[in-house]
């Protein structure tokens, strides 16, 4: 399939609706307009017209919008046909358009891809379109819109520009030693480099917040049977998401619930009680529980406060702790404070946090919510923030590593050539975010995840 073909796709979701939109982009868009509408609409004006088949029979009637390139979303000629949202009507109109020469169905994300290739959007802005559609909270939607409007790209471009100026100075001093620019010892380069590194750290912190808004946090509730895991899931979800009984082993499979804490998505997973089970179904559930635990961002180790006074997880259940990944964050939750009479609250016990609460009554659950938010470094003040993806975080981290290595070359070895190379690599990593330096394979993976009509 060629990028010079004219493409068409339904821009509205499949199924019945009040309005259905077909979008056409490419060189033959004007021919499509003449064939279906009998005329070329006035640019950027809404025309109410019949949509006709090859025999001149009216298939539907609705609004036609004409956006001649390059002043369009894709940078090409674009035609939008807004008719009634019946699947049969839209299918007939789509088939009519596809009978015309050099017109084909668009690939997923191809409209946004063409906007990127025609310099109407950079890559971060194009990704923000999909993120805006998929936003699961108001804050995520606002941050995605900020990214679409170029907030993230501007921050990245400022870093790239600063690195460019720094590289010019360093490489000029290397290429013209007779000018006696003592850039290595006068401290000017190191000062500028420190400034860029500080700015990069600030962008990384904002990107981390944006990633939390987009990706959320995966929290697994684990522990012995009847510790109150399902009750805690229900308390956090604010509804009866899981069945709760006094019978050990009631939960036999993984239960998932998605909530928000001040805008941050939280993926809570309730698991089967961990024990040596004789029942085959329960054993499968326990194995799935361990799979979820190993992939978690944090584990809530649920403890029945009526069965032990211990507060350190290694004392409560050493076998459980021995199997956990060493770097996995743990929060010990002593449940049933309404029975034991323990004081509600949170405290640090060695390397773990300990929370006392009652999942049944809900007392102390707000403390747990605050703890989860703080443990991920999430702040609810995201005014002017932007969304970020994992690849963005990786690119920012790689750029930071190159700057650290470059500074080491400057401070310890006075190696200007090596410093210049690290600056170049850092600039290249940042340019991958906006698509200034990006492989075709990466572009294919990004745009293939979009909707067909986007």
Swiss-Prot record:
Molecular function (GO) terms listed?
GTP binding; GTPase activity; metal ion binding
Q: Which cofactor does it need?
A: K(+)
Q: Which InterPro entries match?
A: G_TrmE, GTP-bd, GTP-bd_TrmE_N, GTPase_MnmE, MnmE_dom2, MnmE_helical, P-loop_NTPase, Small_GTP-bd
Sequence positions that bind Mg(2+): 230, 251
Output the superkingdom of the source species: Bacteria
- BP GO terms, sorted: tRNA methylation; tRNA wobble uridine modification
Q: Residues in domain TrmE-type G?
A: 216-377
Positions binding K(+) in this chain are: 226, 245, 247, 250
Q: Where does (6S)-5-formyl-5,6,7,8-tetrahydrofolate bind?
A: 23, 80, 120, 454
Q: What are the EC numbers?
A: 3.6.-.-
| Metal-binding recorded as keyword | yes
Task: Write down the CDD domains for this protein, in alphabetical order.
Answer: trmE (cd04164), TrmE_N (cd14858)
Keywords assigned by UniProt?
Cytoplasm, GTP-binding, Hydrolase, Magnesium, Metal-binding, Nucleotide-binding, Potassium, tRNA processing
Location of this chain's protein in the cell: Cytoplasm
Function summary: Exhibits a very high intrinsic GTPase hydrolysis rate. Involved in the addition of a carboxymethylaminomethyl (cmnm) group at the wobble position (U34) of certain tRNAs, forming tRNA-cmnm(5)s(2)U34.
UniProt lists the family membership as follows: Belongs to the TRAFAC class TrmE-Era-EngA-EngB-Septin-like GTPase superfamily. TrmE GTPase family.
Name listed for the protein in its UniProt record? tRNA modification GTPase MnmE
